[in-house]
Amino acid sequence: MTLLNPYFGKFGGMYVPQILMPALLELEKNFVEAQKDINFHKTFFNLLKNYAGRPTPLTLCNNLTKGTKTRIYLKREDLLHGGAHKTNQVLGQAILAIRMKKNEIIAETGAGQHGVATAIACALLNLKCRIYMGIKDIKRQHPNVFRMKLMGAEVIPVKNGSGTLKDACNEALRDWSNSYKNSHYMIGTAAGPHPYPTIVREFQKIIGEETKQQILEQETKLPNAIIACVGGGSNAIGIFSNFINDKEVSLIGVEPGGKGIKTGQHGAPLKHGRTGIFFGMKSHLMQDQEGQIQESWSISAGLDFPSVGPEHAWLNSINRAQYVSITDQEALDTFQLLCKKEGIIPALESSHALAYALKLMNLSPKKEQIFVVNLSGRGDKDIFTVHDILKKTGKRI
C-alpha cells in the first residue's frame, strides 16, 4: 500500500518486478518522512544556495526580440553548478539516499548532464557512483563522459538496443534489482515507477518558484506562457508546477520533432504516441502497430527518449498543458541564433523550447506578450555535435 497516490489520472503506477516493490516502498516512506523534516529541508536548500548557486537569474533577451513587442525571458538553469537543472534534484536524492543509509548510487544518462550532476553529488557526499550510458550517447557526448570520470564515477557503456537513453534506463533498473539493499537508483527525470515522478518534481519545483517571484519583480504580472523542452520532462515539470493553478498562463512543452514527424524519426510520444507500459510506468509511448517500442530520434541526446513522464501525460489529457514539436534543424538554427544574438550557448535540448518561443513571437510580432523559456542547460556539451553537422553540410558558422 502506497502512502502517496501513485497515479496522475490514469498515468503513472508501479509496473516493476515484484523484487523491486520493497525498494520503491522504502524510498516512498523515507521521502514522505524527509518532506516533514525541517533539517532535511535546511540541508537541501543550503546545498542549492551555497554549492549549486541558486537562485539562477531570469534574463531578458533584448536582441532576439528587437523589432517586436514580445519579451522573452530565459530562466538560466545553464548557470547552475554542473551546467543544467539536473543538479537540483540530484542533490535532493543524494541526501535522501544517505538518510536511507545507501552508499552506492546507480544512474542512467543520455546527454550526460544527469550523469555529471550525479557524479558531482557523489563526489561531494562521498558516495560510490556507477552510471549507465548508451554507446551512441557516449560518442556524441564525450566531454560529459570525461567530466563524470574526472569526478570518480564509473561510466558503464550500454550496447543493447539503439545504445541510447532508454537502453541505459533498462540496464540501470536491472542493476538496481540486484543491488537495492545497498544502492539507490537515482532516476534522472520525472518518469519511471512511483514515487520517482513525484520525488523529481518536488526537488525541481524550485525552478518554478523562483521564476514566479522573479517575473513578478521584473514585470509585475505573470507571463503569457511558460515554455520548456520535454524528453522525460523534469525541467518542464519543475518550471510548470508553480503555474498549474494560474489558468491565464499557457504551459507549453516542446518535444523533439527530429527529422520531421512524418518521417517517423522523432521523439514526440505525447502527440504522436499511444498509452503503454514502459520504464515501470503507464504513459504515452512510441509504439508500432504490434505494440513494440519504436526507436526515438533527436539531435539532442537528452530528448532522445520514446516515452514521457506521467504527469505530462496527465496535463496533456486534461488540456492544462499544450505539447508541440520542433525539428532538429529548427533547434540547430536557434542554437546558433542565441549564441550570436545574446552571447549564450544553450543546450540543444533547451534550443527546442526557445525555437518554439521564437515561432510564437514571429506569428504575432506586434502583439504585447511575455514568454519565459526554461534554458535547462548550457551547450558546451553540444559544440562538437553542432560543429560536425555544420561541417558535413558545408555551412559556415
From Swiss-Prot:
InterPro entries: Trp_synth_b_CS, Trp_synth_beta, Trp_synth_beta/beta-like, TrpB-like_PALP, TrpB-like_PALP_sf. Pfam families: PALP. The modification N6-(pyridoxal phosphate)lysine is found at residue 86. GO terms for cellular component: cytoplasm. Pathway: Amino-acid biosynthesis; L-tryptophan biosynthesis; L-tryptophan from chorismate: step 5/5. GO terms for molecular function: tryptophan synthase activity. Keywords: Amino-acid biosynthesis, Aromatic amino acid biosynthesis, Lyase, Pyridoxal phosphate, Tryptophan biosynthesis. Belongs to the TrpB family. Tetramer of two alpha and two beta chains. It catalyses: (1S,2R)-1-C-(indol-3-yl)glycerol 3-phosphate + L-serine = D-glyceraldehyde 3-phosphate + L-tryptophan + H2O. Its cofactor is pyridoxal 5'-phosphate. The lineage of its organism: Bacteria, Pseudomonadati, Pseudomonadota, Gammaproteobacteria, Enterobacterales. The beta subunit is responsible for the synthesis of L-tryptophan from indole and L-serine. This is Tryptophan synthase beta chain.
